[in-house]
């Protein structure tokens, strides 16, 4: 995984904003926050987001078209993510489960499928909202 000091200025700025957020952020919300720091074009934001996803610093929540920081310093999963999402407060938790990972790997092997990536999102109510 790429270290933060190897990131571009734009990537560092955007990563910092995402890491400080308690909720997933959409690209245009990020753009609004970074305009005062000299990042004015949506393309600049999307390039930085794509690179940060690729190197595993952030994850994309596909159903929300939003981004969160990877909280697991040992995360090696840039192409395979699993999240639980609260439908009430929209809290997102990244799930790290070795048994689930093994099951998905076995499923892939049994089906003879080569996945480029997968993103699983489980929806329900968190402990606070039940």
PLM regions and their residue ranges:
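Short amphipathic alpha-helical elements of helix-turn-helix/winged-helix folds
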Residues: 13-21, 33, 55
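Short acidic, hydrophobic short linear motifs in intrinsically disordered regions
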Residues: 24-34
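Key DNA-contact positions within bacterial/archaeal DNA-binding proteins
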Residues: 43
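Short, hydrophobic-biased segments on the C-terminal half of alpha helices
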Residues: 46-50
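A short, conserved structural fragment
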Residues: 53-61
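Non-DNA-binding regulatory cores of transcription-related proteins
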Residues: 60, 64, 69-130
């Amino acid at each position: 995984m790429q270290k933060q000091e190897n990131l571009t200025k734009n990537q560092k700025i955007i990563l910092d904003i995402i890491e400080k957020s308690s909720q997933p952020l959409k690209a245009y919300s990020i753009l609004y926050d970074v305009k005062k720091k000299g990042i004015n074009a949506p393309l600049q934001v999307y390039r930085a987001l794509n690179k940060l996803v690729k190197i595993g610093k952030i994850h994309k929540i596909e159903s929300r078209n939003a981004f969160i920081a990877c909280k697991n310093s040992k995360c090696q999963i840039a192409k395979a993510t699993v999240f639980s999402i609260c439908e009430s407060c929209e809290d997102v938790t990244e799930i790290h489960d070795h048994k689930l990972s093994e099951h998905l790997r076995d499923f892939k092997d049994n089906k003879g499928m080569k996945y480029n990536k997968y993103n699983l999102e489980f929806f329900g109510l968190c402990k606070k909202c039940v």
